[in-house]
Amino acid sequence: MKLEGRIAAVTGGSAGIGRGIAEAYLAEGASVAVMARNVEKAEKMLAEVGAGDRLIFIQGDAMDQASVEGFVDQTAAHFGRVDILINNAGGAGDLQPTISLSDESFDECMKWNVYSTFWGTRRALKYMTEQSWGRIINISSMEGKHGKPVLTAYTTAKHAINGMTKSVAREVGTQGITVNAICPGLVITDI
């Protein structure tokens, strides 16, 4: 198993892409902490996956700084460290033409996508720099390379994540830490 003994933390990990990532990491031998808002969905996942003490759920909201930072800290407290962070939580939010998009909707999309990625990354780096090893994987989108009508906030957020990924990768690359973004196309999920 390629990830035997590694500790992974996945935001938005109880459904969709995040659940798939969590299950793949478990299959490769990692222990995994998932953060999600929906307790019922997370408990269902825990029961269905049945990974025993290698899978834990920590309730949290990606739009709340204390939740995201607390998730990373609780993962480290439970498993002893954080080796891999997958910043997966996020979404498109309010799909409106730019002229109709409210400041509140734009800000919410930034918090859900950009700020949550920043908060998780910054906190995980605290642990990863101490151990001189880590992997941060940011789930972005093809929209982070292009643009689409009515996705102004989402496209802006994903462009920001791609820029953040490149900057942080250059900051910490000499310390045994890699930072990458994955830019999937449209994925139909149950979130």
Predicted features along the sequence, with ranges:
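Alpha-helical segment proximal to the catalytic Tyr-Lys
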Residues: K126, R170-T174
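Active-site loop-to-helix junction immediately N-terminal to the catalytic Tyr of the SDR YXXXK motif
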Residues: P97, L101, G147-T155, S167, ...
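The beta1-alpha1 cofactor-binding region of Rossmann-like NAD(H)/NADP(H)-dependent oxidoreductases
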Residues: V39, Q59-F71, D103
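Active-site helix of classical SDR
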Residues: T121, A157, T165
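Substrate-binding pocket helix/loop in short-chain dehydrogenase/reductase
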Residues: Q96-T98, S102-M110, I136
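Conserved glycine-rich cofactor-binding loop
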Residues: I7, S14-G16
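Residue(s) in the substrate-gating loop at a strand-loop-helix junction
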Residues: S141
